[in-house]
C-alpha cells in the first residue's frame, strides 16, 4: 500500500463479505452476484470511476466476472493465483485447511501449527502476535478463522462457475496481468497458459 501510495495511487484493500473484519452475511449468501454487487457498491462509494482491480483467488474471480460480464468497467485487471482453470487437488487442499477445527483453536500455537502444516515452506514466526490478524476470538474463548464458516458450503468451484469464468475471460479487452505463485498448487503452469491462450494480450508473471 505504501509503495502504491508513493507512486501516486489511491489503494484500497477490500475485505469481502464474510472475510477479514467485514460482517458475515446473515443469509449466508456468498454467491458471485453478491460479491460483484458489493464490489460495485464500494467502487461507486469511492467515486473512483474506473479502477485498477487487483484480486487474489476469490477476489480475482469476482473481478473477472464483474468486468467480463460487463457489470463494471476498469482500467486494468490483476489476477493472482486464479484463472478459469484451476487444479482440483489444490482446491481440495484449501477446503481441508478451512474445514479443520470448526469449533476453533485453543491457542495461537495451534493456529501456527495448522498454518505450518498447510504451508511447510514458510518459516514459522517466533512471535505469534501477528497471527491474531488471521483469526478472531469467538464467544467460546477459542480462535476461529477470519471468515464465515458458512462459506465452506458456498465456495464457488462448481463446473457452472468455472464455465462462467471462461466466458468472462473471452470478453476481456482491458490490460490484464496474471500472477502465479511459483509454489502454487491451485493455479498450475498449464492453467496459466490456458488462460494466456484464451486472453493472448495478457501479461504473465510466475
Predicted features, each with a name:
Residues 7, 70, 198:
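Conserved dinucleotide-binding and phosphotransfer motif residues
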Residues 2-6, 10-54:
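Active-site loop/oxyanion-hole signature of alpha/beta-hydrolase fold enzymes
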Residues 19-22, 85, 186:
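Active-site loop signature of alpha/beta-hydrolase-fold enzymes
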Residues 45-90:
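Conserved hydrolase catalytic core segment
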Residues 85-147:
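Helix-rich cap/lid subdomain of alpha/beta-hydrolase
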Residues 10, 49-52, 73-76, 175-177, ...:
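Structural signature of beta-strand start/N-cap positions in the alpha/beta core
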Residues 12-14, 56, 80, 179, ...:
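The conserved SAM/SAH-binding core of class I Rossmann-like methyltransferase domains
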Residues 137-198, 203:
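Conserved serine/cysteine hydrolase catalytic core
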